[in-house]
């Protein structure tokens, strides 16, 4: 997920109450998932900086790009689902609908996230490249 999406959800969770009157942000699962999402964003950033550094140095890199892409797209997919789950049924409201949390961005990202595991090479291909390049495992196909 992008940091603006995390920020938008945090704002929503701080100012929205569950049906029992407790703010969403007071739910320990919500807090843990927000922290995990932020940590994953920083891990993605580290992967990207490392890959960019290797490219700038002219170093031939192999699996670093695949690792960056795989981690980023799989994290985005996971976190987008988390945000929908944490918002409840309202999280499924479309972009622009009046009652949609975060202006409907949760649904927008949830529907877009699976595509990121396909373009630039599917997650399966990335896993195979990492298995071959980093672990020395034989090709699967």
Say what each PLM segment does:
Residues 1-141:
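Alpha-helical interface subdomain recognition
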